[in-house]
């Protein structure tokens, strides 16, 4: 049976995220280990890390996925932003190791006008390579596809393949596939189907064996819109048939399926989870 869950809040304390995941009925979940909107991160006290790990072990939920905060840009043109981005990625890998979190999802950033795309790729490769070399533990960095907005790195499967192929520490580099981002970038999951689109990903980005997380999101925009706006499952362009197609595609059944859908007056997280469970059979 596939594992389904959400991005959950750590408000109050890290161990409370486990309680929230349990309350929502999650099999797996994603967090930020810190505020995603600032550079500075308060160190995780050993007692807090121990409480988080204990709560997780008791819950039976897993794997847990961490997401990089918003400010780092591993393709940054400005040297000070680039250096801080590498430091933050290294720090976040160490925080994952402290919390026994196996996966850290990262976007690949935006390159500057002067640098151009190829230079942006080279910076991302160097940044991730340095972070892996300088961090402790075995946490994997998962490269996430984007909606291919202007100047982004990682907006095409080929782009992700260039990054992953250049990183020699392959055992600690994997993938996160976002369904909304893929379709917004022009990969029509609705029109071509999961088997075809994930086949392209396998051929151009890397083996599906290295795909560890699916961000299962419907979308407010259409194919090729480059609009990164998530919608409730089945209520956006992709629709229930496409979500079912993704959830039942055998070659990705080993992945953790994380929803980053809205929680509002239309649907709660529990409502979206019920839809996902219905569409997974």
From Swiss-Prot:
The protein's superkingdom reads Archaea
Which E.C. number(s) belong to this protein?
A: 3.1.21.2
- Xref: SUPFAM superfamilies: Xylose isomerase-like
* Any GO BP annotation: base-excision repair
The catalytic activity, as recorded, is:
Endonucleolytic cleavage to 5'-phosphooligonucleotide end-products
Q: Which residues bind Zn(2+) 3?
A: 181, 228, 230
For this UniProt entry, the molecular function terms from Gene Ontology, in alphabetical order, are: deoxyribonuclease IV (phage-T4-induced) activity; DNA binding; DNA-(apurinic or apyrimidinic site) endonuclease activity; phosphoric diester hydrolase activity; zinc ion binding
Which cofactors does it use?
Zn(2+)
Q: How is the cofactor bound?
A: Binds 3 Zn(2+) ions.
The entry's keywords? DNA damage, DNA repair, Endonuclease, Hydrolase, Metal-binding, Nuclease, Zinc
Q: Which residues bind Zn(2+) 1?
A: 67, 107, 144
Recorded hits in Pfam families, A to Z, give: AP_endonuc_2 (PF01261)
Q: Where does Zn(2+) 2 bind?
A: 144, 178, 215, 260
What family is it from? Belongs to the AP endonuclease 2 family.
Q: Which PANTHER family match?
A: APURINIC-APYRIMIDINIC ENDONUCLEASE (PTHR21445:SF0), ENDONUCLEASE IV ENDODEOXYRIBONUCLEASE IV (PTHR21445)
| Known role | Endonuclease IV plays a role in DNA repair. It cleaves phosphodiester bonds at apurinic or apyrimidinic (AP) sites, generating a 3'-hydroxyl group and a 5'-terminal sugar phosphate.
UniProt-recorded name of the protein: Probable endonuclease 4
